[in-house]
Each structure stands twice: as C-alpha cells, then as structure tokens.
Amino acid sequence: MTIEIQDILILIKEYLLNIFAFDPNSPLLFTHFRFWAFFAVVFTGFSIVAGSLHKNRSGARLHLPGWRRVLRNGYLFLISLLFYYKTSGLFVGLLILVTLTDFFLARGIYRFRQKAINKGHEKSKMALFLLCLSVTIDLGILCYFKYSYFFADIVNQIFGTNFQVTNIAARLGNHIIGRPFWSVDRIVLPVGISFYTFQVISYTADVYKGLVRPVRNILDFGFYVSFFPQLVAGPIIKASDFIPQLYRRYALSRTQFGIAVFWILNGLTKKIVMSDYLAVNFIDRVFANPQLFSGFENLAALFAYSFQVYADFSGYTDIAIGLSLMMGFYLPQNFNSPYKAQNARNFWKRWHISLSRWLQTYLYIPLGGNRNISFGTWFWICVITIAALILSGSWIVAVIVLAIALATVITALRSPGKRRHIYANMNSMITMLLGGLWHGASCNFMIWGGLNGVGMIIFKFWSDWHTVKRIIVTSYVVCILFLLRLWASPALALWNVLLCFCAFILVSMIIKCIWQYYNSQRDYVRWPRFAKATNVVWSVIVTFTFITFTRLFFRSGSNLDPAVANETAWNIATSMMTRIGTEWTVNPLDVIPAYWKVFLLFCIGMAIHWIPERMKRRYRYLFAKLPLPLMVLVCAFAIFIIYQFVTAEMQPFIYFQL
C-alpha cells in the first residue's frame, strides 16, 4: 500500500514538473491541444476567482473593490507569466524586467508632470528625461535581441570589418551563476518582444501626454502588459482602451459567450484549414526551391501566400479576441477585410490596424505628420541612405537616394502651396520603411515597407488626376518599361512583370475613358450600378495584386537565420521574380489539376473574405443566438472538420517570431 502511494506521489510530482517545464520544441500555441487543456484549467480557476465578482442585479456597481480586483488581475498576471514561460522559457525574466521598469518610470513621469503643472508649467524636463529613458531601455532591449545581426552586417559592409555578434546577456548570466548554462554564440529572439515593447512605449508616452493616469498596482500593470491571449502576436493594446477594463466587474452575457466561441472557431478555421494547408501543400514547396517551378506556379504561390499571411495573422487575432471576451475583456479589431481595400492607403487602414495606429501616433505625427519635417525626419533620411548603400553595395546609389531627398526638400521650400503634401509624403515614406523594419531584421522587410510607402504616395497623386492624365502618365511608363525590356539586363524579369501590371492598368483606364465619353453623349448614365461595381472590383484587383507582389520581399525575409538573412532573402526574392518574369513554358491548365485542392481552397477563402461585412455580422449573431445544445453540436462538427486538416507537424504562426 505504501509503495502504491509513493508511486502515485511520484507520478503527481512528474506531472507537475512537466506542467512547469519549458520545452523549446513544444511552445503553447493556439493550435495545440495542450493549450486548450491549459486554457480549460485557467478558465476554471478564473471562474472560481471571478465567480463572486459579477455585477449585482441592480447594476449599481460596475467597478470592483480593490482586493477583488487585485485577486482577479493578479491571478491572470501570474497565468500570463506561466504562459510566456511555457512559450519562451527564461525570457519571462525579460518581460518582468520591462514591466517593472516602465511601471516605476511611468509613475515618476506622472509625478514630475503634476509638479510642473502645479507650478504653472506645461512641460517637465525631468518627466521628459524619464520618458526618454523608458523609450531608450525598451528600444535598446528590442534592438539588441532583434537587430544585432542587422546592425553588425551594416558595420561590416561599410568599414570592411568582420565583426561577430556574441550574446552579451548570456555571457553575463553565465558569469553570475558561475557555469556555462546559456549559449553565447547566438542571440535568440524572445517571442512577442516587438509587440510588448511597443505596448509599454505607448503607455509611458500616453502618461507623459496626460492621456492616461499611471496604474497604481504592479499586478494590474503586469496584467496589462502580459495578458496572454495577445501577448505574443498582438494586437498592440493602447493603455487608454484596456486599463479601464481592469477595474470593471466580470460580466459575460449569453450572446457574448456565443460571439466569443464563434471568434475562436473562426480563427482556428483560418489558421488550420486555410493557412497551414496552403503552406504545407504548396506555398512552402515553391518558396523553398523557386527555380524548380514554372513562372505560373511561382505566381500562384505568391498570391496564395498573400492570403496565407492574412489567414494566419487574423486567425491568431480572432482566437485572441474570443479568449479575451470569454474572460470579460475586449481587444480592438486588428483586421477589417484588408483585401477589400481599393488602394494601398486604405489597405493599411484595414491591415494590422493596431500597428498602423501606433506608427501614426508615435512615429508619423512626431516626425511632423502632414505639416512639417523635423530633426527626426533628417535623422531617418541619413539612416535610409546608409541602408541604400548596404543594399546596393554602391556609393552611387546612396548618393542618388540622398540627392532625391534633398531635391524633394528644396522643391517643398520653393513651392509653399505643395509644401505640406511633400512633407507628408516624406514622413509617410519614413514611417512605412521603419514599419517594414519592425517586422524583421532584414533589408527585404525595408524594401517591403518602402514599396507600400511608394504605393500610398502614388495613390495620392493618382486620386487627384483626371482619367486622361492617368492614361498619358501610364502610357509613358509602359513605353519606358517596353524599352527597358528590349535591353538585356539582369532586371529583365522585373521589367516584364511591371510592364504587364502597368499595361493592365492602361487598358483599364482606356476602357473607363471610353465609357465616360459614351455616357457624356447621353442624357442619362447607363447602368450606373454596374459601372460603380466594376470600378470597385478593378480597384480591389489592382490593389490586391500590388500588395501581393510586395509580399515577395516579406515572405523571402521571414523565418531566416538573422546572421545570413539579408543575402538569403534577396536570393529567394530575385529567383522568384526571375521565374515569374521569364519562365512561362508550362501550360497553367496542366498545373491547376495537380493542385486543385489548393486552388479551390484559395478561391473559397477569398470568396468568404469578400462577403459584405453586414452579412458577416448577421451570421455571427445568428450563431451566438443558437440554443446551447445546437451550438455544442455545431462546434463539435466544426472542430471535427478543422482537425481533418491538421498536418503532422504544426505550423507556427507567421507573426510568432516578431
């Protein structure tokens, strides 16, 4: 009997050790059964902790008493730390360090700001110093772990050195504990560091601006920073949106519960059925060896990847929104059907909305926004010039980039009427370049961000032009590309792709001009709804195609060893562009039957994506209103279908390593 009890105790001990053990090969992902077992236990504990915290029936008290709030938020803070430890190991210490640092610095910022206001001053130098210290610490941590190899590559390229990156933090840790516990020859990127550093920067900045009061309790602030559903891949939550929720009572209606379940199922479907299946069965094969596939297959893989990255990232966000809602917290919308966008500018109002707003609030506007340029603008122009030098390996290109920037500023100074537009475009371009670099430490990400910036600027000019002017300008571009195509060069494939794209736009503009002339000769506009719908469809197709080709640089720069990311990413991108622009010997009709499931799934996914938003809201509400037994049956059927698509090896979320 004693032996049996000992065996049981040993099993319990091993089980508990396994729960709190970190396995780098098995992080807690939303698509793993282990996570849902983890969440079931967490939600059970949360229900016990928050069960007595419901709003009373009269609704008189919406806020929690202090000790109950601390109990609930402290519980979720500790659970979030456990989740991050299971996902990223001892990097949980880094998360705690950032939390403690910004908690105390924000309190200091608020204290000195209030003293300045009481003395009749608008600003406090000490508060500004603490803000700069907070931003320096947060960005310093981010740059060390994410951009060390990138910066080392720049230094080596410019000065011809052979500087090697070593893990200083690991070396220091080994020295403290007195033994070689951590590897010092490689810097590992902590999961989600790009998200939570930006989140705490926005918090201290908003405290400095007086937009929010600092959180008084470290457990409340820690919960805000580390809330596990959105910790590793966003959305980036503004303090003013989330902190007030920390003090509210837990309340979850029957309809809200149904909506939460719908978001979770919707996210799992996007991730497993759409994203992972397309990646494993087609996209990854082509991107791994683009030279083995035809131009059509490379092009199809590029369009499929454009949908995959949306399904992957928005799928994570949907699950995060659903999990948060079940616990009574609301996360902001991060995607609004981005491939319905009719131009690049509108796309970025629909895609990764939380990041777009962060960049606008904390980068674009401080640079001067649409009014002026600042010292920061000139600083980043110099940085971009250096980046151009690294990309091309030629001083001539760097000089050209700098000359263009100077010519743009001189033009703005000599043309007061256009000055604000020019400054706005400069600041917008810098914002997009840095937004691209936020996604990854590779020049390809900067190219991706720069292309999006160019697309936004071109649209601003395009929207001001008459149809005839659009035709004339596009005709010039087509002629130039045609002449470049006749000149044999390594960029022949690029000229071919651009020529096809611009020729499509030109033909479309000519048809539109003829249609407008035809209707101008009549007393009424014929088929106005058809004309409007056609124009919308055309704009969506052009925008989707443009965004898809920028993804070439996004995909080729992802999931690479930081030490060789620049060279590898560039080789993948150029190889795919070469195949797309020149290799069309294989008949597309012979390719489609071989991958018919992939093409069918892509078409179904895009069709669902393009469903009008009012219809999506309607079927979400209908699902939420289903009787509970019927909802359980629908969920069971959906889960059964979803896990028919599960691959042997689960695919990590694309944004998991940002």
Predicted regions and their residues:
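Membrane-embedded transmembrane alpha-helical bundles that form the catalytic cores
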Residues: T2-Q657
